Swiss-Prot record:
Record keywords: Autophagy, Coiled coil, Cytoplasm, Membrane, Protein transport, Transport
GO cellular component: cytoplasm; membrane
Compositional bias per record (Acidic residues), positions renumbered to this chain: 167-179
Ranges where the record places region Disordered: 167-188, 412-457
Main function: Required for cytoplasm to vacuole transport (Cvt) vesicle formation and efficient autophagy. Plays a role in ATG protein retrieval from the pre-autophagosomal structure (PAS) and is especially required for autophagy-dependent cycling of ATG9. Also plays a role in regulation of filamentous growth.
Domain of life: Eukaryota
Upper lineage: Eukaryota, Fungi, Dikarya, Ascomycota, Saccharomycotina
Sections of the chain in a coiled coil: 287-397
Biased composition (Low complexity): 412-443
The protein's name in its UniProt record: Autophagy-related protein 23
Biological process annotations from GO: autophagy; protein transport
Subcellular location: Cytoplasm; Membrane
Major localization class: cytoplasm
Length: 491
């Protein structure tokens, strides 16, 4: 199917070239008719080329008609491609919005709300006990004081010494009073045993209480650390999820661009076959206006469907009518050649007969003009008719016998023209065969600047020279507006 459409595109391009070439020929034909230096060969060749173009356009049009099924299928495919582009556009908008959401910087920072439910009460039950203890002792004798530590060491030594002494003297039979005095010296101080024992109980209670508080704090700290670990793991997970979704959305957008490129290549709107996700400037412009581009192509194909059969009728009419024109002109030319050839030995020629034949041809051309409304064809025939009308007007001014010298030159010119071979470019044969091999040869599309040898632009001149008029001779006219020098060559 794709190859068929490509061939159709080539045929449409060939058709356009042929139309352009035809317009060049029409202008060139008109210039030839108004140039006295133009040869009859070039003029006939131009008429033939115009007919060839009509034939070529008819055959090209017939080939296009044979592609109607492919054209309809192509129109269907183009409509489906429009639907695909519209879907891709919607997907692009969707995924682009998603991508923007994932990249959004508009997310507000959530502040922690102050609430009684968020407060934790820490028990400090040991502090009242500790304060009670501190109130009952002398701070200088506590472990907070360095002096206490020093005294404590001395007292310990004394205590140890006393005990040792007591042990050594334990078997001595000393005076009991001495024992009593010694005992009194060891225990006689300012400290109250009851108070110390009470403080011990107080400190033990304080110790157990603060340990309980520490256990509570350690449990709370452990929970805090667990929460911190969870938060860090969740933060990492959410960041990965964000990166994943951003990458995913970007991949979706890249795939959309690749699909768009494939569609552009399929319908011939992109020559870049590198299927990357990056669109160049031209591709972006085409995609932005893709509906207009495709609808324009669909409309063009619909025109091909609706107009080609009508075009065949018009083109066939052009061929037939232009052939009639060429035949009319050839018949007139041949009649005049035969007439002049038969009367080449006579001393006079009846111009009335020649004028009558030309007028008959003019009338026939008028009938052809009236039978068509094709402006291009009407212009071509009108240009030919104007030359014939001017020829009759000038012949009416020259109703005198021709001398033998001029007559001989006319005859020789006729013989030379009969022996002239006119070559033309090969073109499509005018038949109903629509084989693609019948396309125009590329040589037929010559440059518009120089399709034929350069021509002049002087107005048509059919007149009597001073020399011929003085000798009562007639001025020969060149049918189809060729110059006398070209038509009549003296040996």
């Amino acid at each position: 199917m794709k190859n068929q459409i490509n061939k159709l595109d080539d045929i449409l391009l060939q058709q356009q070239h042929t139309n352009d070439y035809l317009l060049e020929l029409v202008k060139f034909h008109n210039n030839l008719l108004h140039d006295n230096l133009t040869s009859i060969e070039n003029l006939n060749l131009t008429r033939k080329k115009i007919l060839d173009c009509f034939n070529d356009l008819f055959n090209l049009n017939s080939i296009i008609i044979n592609y109607h099924g492919d054209i309809k299928l192509e129109i269907k495919n183009l409509k489906e491609i429009i639907i695909k582009f519209n879907k891709l556009n919607k997907l692009e908008i969707f995924y682009q919005n998603k991508l923007n959401q994932w990249k959004s910087s508009k997310v507000k920072q959530i502040q922690s709300a102050s609430s009684t439910n968020n407060k934790i009460t820490i028990n400090c039950n040991y502090q009242p006990l500790l304060k009670t203890y501190l109130n009952q002792i002398d701070p200088d004798e506590s472990t907070l004081s360095n002096q206490f530590n020093s005294n404590l060491s001395i007292n310990d030594e004394k205590l140890i010494y006393t005990n040792e002494s007591f042990t050594e003297d334990e078997d001595d039979t000393g005076d009991e009073d001495n024992d009593i005095d010694h005992s009194n010296n060891h225990t006689n101080n300012d400290e109250d045993p009851f108070l110390i024992l009470s403080n011990i109980k107080l400190l033990e209670n304080c110790q157990s209480t603060i340990k309980a508080d520490i256990n509570q704090l350690e449990f709370l700290l452990s929970n805090y650390k667990k929460d911190l670990k969870f938060i860090e793991n969740e933060l990492n997970s959410q960041n990965l999820k964000t990166k994943y979704n951003i990458t995913l959305m970007q991949e979706k957008l890249d795939k959309i661009n690749i699909k768009r490129k494939k569609l552009l290549i399929k319908i011939g709107l992109s020559k870049n076959k590198n299927l990357t996700s990056v669109l160049d400037k031209d591709e972006k412009i085409i995609i932005e206006n893709i509906n207009d581009f495709i609808n324009s192509k669909i409309n063009s194909l619909n025109d091909q469907l609706s107009n080609k059969k009508e075009n065949s009728i018009v083109l066939n009419q052009k061929i037939n009518l232009w052939e009639q024109v060429i035949n009319q002109l050839n018949d007139l030319e041949n009649s005049l050649k035969i007439y002049l050839s038969k009367n080449k030995k006579k001393k006079s020629i009846d111009y009335n007969i020649m004028i009558e034949w030309i007028n008959d041809t003019i009338n026939n051309l008028n009938d052809i003009i009236d039978s068509t409304d094709i402006q291009l064809l009407r212009n071509l025939i009108e240009n030919e008719k104007k030359v014939l009308v001017q020829a009759t007007n000038e012949l009416k001014l020259n109703l005198t016998p021709v001398n033998s010298k001029i007559n001989d030159s006319i005859s020789k010119s006729i013989n030379n023209n009969n022996n002239t071979n006119i070559t033309t470019n090969t073109s499509i044969n005018n038949n109903n065969n629509t084989n693609e091999n019948s396309l125009l040869d590329s040589s037929q599309f010559q440059s518009s600047k120089n399709p034929f040898p350069n021509i002049g632009t002087s107005p048509p001149k059919i007149s009597i020279s001073e020399h011929i008029a003085s000798n009562n001779s007639f001025t020969t006219f060149q049918l189809n507006n060729t110059s006398n020098d070209k038509l009549m060559k003296n040996e």
